[in-house]
């Protein structure tokens, strides 16, 4: 029976009230969290807590005091004041110093190094429990490992039940992944002290029944930069202070979107820690909305690949947590909200996709340690069914308030977790077991990556990501034949495919396929099948889904985005095929076949050829202008011919590039052009560096060197062409394109981003004032760079900037209406496969599109209206709708036929329109469309409504300006480490920067 919506909500609230305090059913709320009356209180510290808390109901009995200890230091030992005190933000090093003081003072605390950031800063995990539990940690971990992989106990529920009774859980808490969200480190410092020292019955129960594991600072590089910014702010009262331009070395807010691609150190360090401790929960602490939003419950749609038990755990923990804090009298605490739980890209979701429980708090914060008057908007303070006790509309908020809320929420929830630990461990086991049983229950049985002609480097990258996700990978040692049920229609095809329409009543037949030896198999009968399934499957978000505002990307299918053909197999016989486990799939394995002075490397859309060119910078490298056959192999257009290089240097470079080099007895009989080593600059603005950071990390990981410059540099550098061949201008993601020129408003004081004694961590780039933009001088310098033969590569908003400022003659932004798309994977078709940019590709490609941006092109520099056959509507006159009107009393003169261009083509001008037309672009300078959206099967994964507005429109265009080129991407080809399949579009262009000026395709 399906209850009405209001009834279901009421039922949820009833359930919440029932589960709020089952562990303390014997005790009224007033005693559930009572102190030990025999334990002394640190009166000075407690007085400061009261002083810095701006209203009594912004605290609770759990955090309105601090127990005293003669041997264990409080956070004040390092901070000089209590946690949450005004004007104090500790560096990560100081946070670590305190935790190590704790570990040195009590056997209930241990500190571990779990890795380092890209800039070499340490990340730690702190384990807190009774000394006896920590002493048993290895034995307990061995038991948890068996629950995590029930194959080790033969899937025996009885054995598992015994292990559950003997074991205690691990609850992993992470703080400050988002650097401007500053409160978690001090809250966790004080909470760790409480867990180690407090003798309140509920604390003692927590200590004796579970390990609390804490990583107080996840984004260590960004934390130290944020503290620098705050120190600058304190040293310059009354002045505007710089915004935090760089968080981590590469990305800012998107560091919490890396749980799929596993690109950043912090993601790998947290996942490895979570799995090596066999933790049951990963609870990530954030700051934004008032006063505390426990988005554990979240909103629909829920991720389609998680175990249903997790949905129940989210509901139980989230509603319980809110219920307890409501009963403690703290306003503005709620769950549900509008955060959909669809994307697995968030850090916390590492747990959800590895059989654990993902949780997240958003606590109100001020972006520093100031105490501020905060004025809320109606959407923040108005009451709704899931927010019956909303935040106050006007509030004086302090960092101490933040710490009170965060600690109270954590302490109540881990208390509930400890009291019900056997339930969570049992669920942990059953979720792991069902992951292994996936093939026989809901399927699929496996995913297979055939060992057929495809890009070795892209395939290796996909396998590497799966390996980082701790997914087991096997490889067929013999052929394997499977039969998959028929689909309603074939997977997305190129528009050039020759397909015949089926009769409406024709029944599609099951498909049988044989995979050759060497094919990779990702079995679904393994503990972490869910993350593999979520990444390798496709996603569909219905346009009429009740959730109208997706929180993040709606599609991410990795086989499409990596351009690695992968088959979803439901036939369980694949699991009986002969295969061997692969220990380090994706590791460098390129090799040179044969020996000789000339070698060829096929370009199958490899992502590593540009880096290979730099590794062999002294070699003679040429690029094939056409396909050729040599040494029994076929080589595509864009393949490399390498000469004058030592065998050792070649072998090392080829291995690292994960490609196969073939020795030739002579140079191939094919047209070649030289491949000079490009001089690259990566240009950023001082508006935002979030999205361009993904480009930098891709270049760095693929060993492509570049100079890192900014728009202010360009405004002062008149001769860019003497220094660079290519300038990359990645998406900005903030502000209108006009802000690239204008910069930030010049009101007030300068906003420096500089390394100084006061701000030693403000590095990566430098400026005395972040406000000035590119300016008109900088724009002219960019134009001069391109007109003198340089290549400017742009994407999304920087492509719109190039169009608006006249750098892309004949290219315009497609004005679409009614398109509903949020981070989806779309099909695309190559228009000019002869362009060097398209080298190594076939007819089609899957691309990531953030919002459906596309282009149109014209043969004129202004988008003048050229009437086409599609636009024509016949006038009133003789004949029917399809007939021509024939005036009376004269001979018939046939009109000039109206053009009928395709959506990706420019409308041709007739003689009348071309005569003495100063705006007509000469043919050799007309834009060249390389890639367009598909005309059918456009949506591959995610959400798309209004496809007709963007179908067949250009998305990658080579615009010609003077002697140079501006390459425009409507999509983002280098995004979150996920769009590996479109990387070569950028890299091909760079390698062929001086070979792009060819006539536009007709």
Where are these regions (language model features)?
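Bacterial N-terminal signal peptides that target proteins for export
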Residues: 1-12
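Bacterial N-terminal signal peptides
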Residues: 10-22
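Intrinsic-disorder/low-complexity accessory segments
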Residues: 26-211, 251, 257, 263, ...
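Mobile, glycine- and charge-enriched loop segments
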Residues: 212-264
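Short, solvent-exposed turn/loop segments enriched in Gly/Ser/Thr/Pro and often Arg
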Residues: 217-220, 230, 285-292, 798
């Amino acid at each position: 029976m399906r209850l009405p919506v209001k009834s279901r909500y009421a039922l949820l609230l009833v359930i919440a009230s029932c589960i709020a305090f089952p562990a303390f059913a014997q005790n009224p709320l007033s005693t559930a969290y009572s102190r030990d009356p025999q334990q002394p209180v640190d009166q000075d510290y407690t007085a400061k807590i009261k002083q810095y808390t701006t209203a009594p109901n912004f605290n609770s009995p759990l955090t309105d005091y601090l127990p005293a200890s003669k041997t264990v230091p409080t956070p004040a030992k390092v901070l000089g004041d209590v946690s949450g005190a005004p004007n104090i933000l500790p560096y990560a090093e100081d946070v670590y110093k305190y935790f190590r003081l704790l570990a040195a003072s009590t056997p209930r605390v241990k500190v571990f190094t779990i890795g380092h950031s890209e800039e070499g800063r340490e990340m730690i995990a702190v384990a807190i429990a009774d000394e006896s539990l920590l002493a048993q940690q290895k034995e307990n971990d061995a038991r948890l490992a068996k629950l995590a992989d029930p194959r080790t106990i033969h899937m025996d529920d009885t054995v598992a039940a015994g292990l559950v009774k003997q074991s205690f859980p691990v609850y992993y808490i992470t703080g400050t992944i988002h650097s401007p969200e500053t409160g978690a480190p001090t809250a966790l410092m004080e909470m760790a002290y409480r867990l180690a020292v407090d003798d309140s019955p509920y604390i003692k129960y927590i200590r004796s029944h579970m390990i609390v594991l804490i990583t107080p600072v996840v984004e260590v590089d960004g934390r130290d930069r944020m503290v620098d910014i705050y120190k600058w702010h304190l040293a310059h009262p009354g002045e505007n202070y710089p915004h935090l331009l760089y968080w981590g070395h590469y990305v800012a807010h998107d560091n919490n979107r890396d749980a799929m691609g596993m690109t950043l150190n912090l993601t790998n360090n947290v996942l490895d820690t979570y799995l090596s401790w066999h933790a049951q929960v990963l609870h990530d602490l954030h700051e934004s909305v008032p006063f505390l939003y426990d988005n554990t419950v979240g909103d629909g749609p829920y991720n389609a690949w998680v175990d249903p038990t997790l949905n129940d755990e989210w509901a139980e923990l989230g509603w319980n947590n809110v219920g307890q804090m409501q009963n403690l009298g703290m306003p503005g605490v709620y769950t549900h909200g509008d955060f959909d739980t669809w994307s697995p890209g968030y850090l916390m979701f590492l747990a959800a996709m590895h059989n654990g429980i993902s949780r997240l708090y958003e606590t109100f914060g001020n972006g520093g340690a100031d105490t501020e008057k905060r004025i809320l908007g109606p959407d923040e303070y108005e009451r709704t069914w899931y927010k019956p006790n909303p935040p106050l509309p006007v509030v004086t908020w302090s960092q101490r308030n933040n710490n009170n809320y965060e600690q109270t929420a954590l302490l109540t929830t881990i208390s509930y977790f400890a009291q019900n630990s056997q339930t969570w461990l049992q669920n942990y086991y059953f979720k792991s077991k069902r992951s292994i049983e996936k093939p026989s229950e809901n399927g699929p049985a496996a995913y297979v990556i055939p060992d057929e002609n495809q890009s070795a480097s892209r395939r290796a990258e996909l396998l590497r990501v799966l390996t980082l996700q701790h997914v087991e990978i096997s490889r067929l040692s013999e052929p394997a034949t499977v039969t998959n049920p028929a689909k309603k229609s074939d997977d997305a095809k190129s528009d050039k495919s020759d397909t015949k329409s089926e009769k409406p009543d024709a029944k599609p037949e099951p498909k049988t396929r044989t995979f050759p030896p060497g094919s990779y198999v990702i079995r679904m009968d393994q503990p972490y099948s869910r993350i593999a399934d979520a990444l390798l499957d496709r996603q569909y978000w219905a346009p009429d889904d009740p959730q109208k505002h997706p929180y993040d990307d709606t599609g991410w299918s990795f086989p499409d985005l990596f351009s690695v053909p992968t088959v979803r197999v439901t036939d369980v016989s694949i699991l009986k095929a002969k295969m061997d486990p692969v220990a380090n799939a994706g590791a460098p394995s390129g090799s040179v076949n044969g020996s000789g002075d000339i070698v060829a490397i096929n370009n199958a859309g490899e992502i590593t050829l540009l880096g290979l060119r730099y590794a062999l910078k002294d070699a003679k490298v040429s690029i094939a202008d056409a396909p050729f056959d040599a040494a029994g192999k076929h080589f595509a257009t864009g393949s490399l011919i390498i000469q004058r290089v030592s065998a050792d240097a070649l072998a090392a470079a080829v291995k690292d590039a994960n490609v196969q080099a073939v020795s030739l007895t002579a140079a191939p009989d094919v047209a070649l052009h030289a491949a000079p080593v490009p001089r690259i600059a990566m240009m950023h603005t001082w508006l935002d560096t979030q999205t361009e950071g993904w480009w930098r990390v891709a270049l760095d990981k693929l060993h492509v060197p570049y100079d890192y410059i900014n728009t202010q540099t360009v405004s002062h550098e008149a001769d860019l062409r003497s220094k660079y061949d290519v300038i990359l201008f990645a998406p900005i993601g903030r502000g209108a394109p006009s802000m690239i020129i204008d910069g930030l408003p010049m009101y007030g004081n300068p906003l420096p981003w500089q390394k100084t004694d006061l701000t030693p961590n403000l590095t990566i780039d430098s400026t005395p004032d972040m406000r000035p933009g590119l300016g008109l001088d900088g724009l002219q310098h960019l134009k001069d760079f391109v007109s003198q033969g340089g290549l400017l590569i742009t994407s999304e908003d920087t492509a719109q900037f190039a169009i608006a400022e006249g750098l892309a003659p004949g290219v315009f932004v497609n004005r679409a209406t009614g398109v509903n798309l949020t981070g989806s994977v779309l099909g695309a078709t190559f228009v000019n496969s002869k362009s060097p940019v398209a080298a190594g590709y076939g007819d089609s490609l899957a691309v990531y599109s953030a919002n459906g941006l596309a282009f149109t092109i014209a043969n004129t520099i202004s988008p003048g209206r050229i009437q086409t056959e599609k636009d024509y509507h016949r006038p009133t006159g003789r004949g029917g709708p399809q007939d021509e009107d024939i005036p009376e009393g004269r001979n018939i003169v046939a009109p000039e036929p109206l053009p009928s261009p395709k959506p990706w083509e420019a409308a041709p001008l007739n003689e009348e329109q071309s005569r003495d037309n100063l705006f007509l672009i000469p043919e050799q300078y007309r834009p060249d469309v390389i890639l367009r959206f598909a005309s059918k099967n456009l949506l591959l994964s995610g959400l798309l409504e209004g496809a007709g507005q963007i179908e067949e429109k250009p998305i990658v265009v080579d615009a010609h300006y003077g002697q140079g080129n501006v390459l425009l991407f409507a999509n983002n080809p280098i995004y979150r480490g996920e769009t590996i399949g479109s990387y070569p579009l950028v890299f091909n262009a760079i390698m062929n920067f001086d070979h792009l000026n060819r006539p536009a395709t007709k």
